[in-house]
Amino acid sequence: MIKKIILVLSLFGLCSLAFAEGKVFNKDYSGIKEIQATITTDEGEIVIDLNFKEAPNTVANFVDLAEKGFYNGLTFHRVINGFMIQGGDPDGNGTGGPGYTIDDEPNKLLHEYGVISMANRGPNTAGSQFFITQMAQHHLDGKHTVFGRVTKGNDVVCRVEQFDRIINIKILEKK
């Protein structure tokens, strides 16, 4: 009998996970012209214009985590030269996140050279992990939410090595 109860409870838990919706941030962007993130790494600074018009919830999630200091001290745990650098995993091995997921935000932004996009394990599974492209990666279009573009520090993106640290991420909202 106890085994049946455990089985039923386990199935209920799995079903509730399957139908869970991603976390939604209700950030008001009225009056804001642009949002920039400066990622300070062991190799230098990367400045990114965040596109809150095309990916409002994704940007709000990234900004919220950055302002809480979530990314401070984490590493770029995955670096594939000529492809991308990936960070934002508190476990440092590609499996960690903030304890919740956000839904994808399909948009017209493409995986061109120097864009920031959310890493995921499939549809609607993004959390805190992001990657920055070192070259155009159009095979990723429609599979990951692009939410910004590097405006300064592409040379830093190309110098980052696996396990280099994200010292901090500072957010600047221009009105």
Model-derived features: positions:
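Cyclophilin-like peptidyl-prolyl cis-trans isomerases
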Residues: I2, G13-K175
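Sec-dependent signal peptide recognition
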Residues: K3-V8
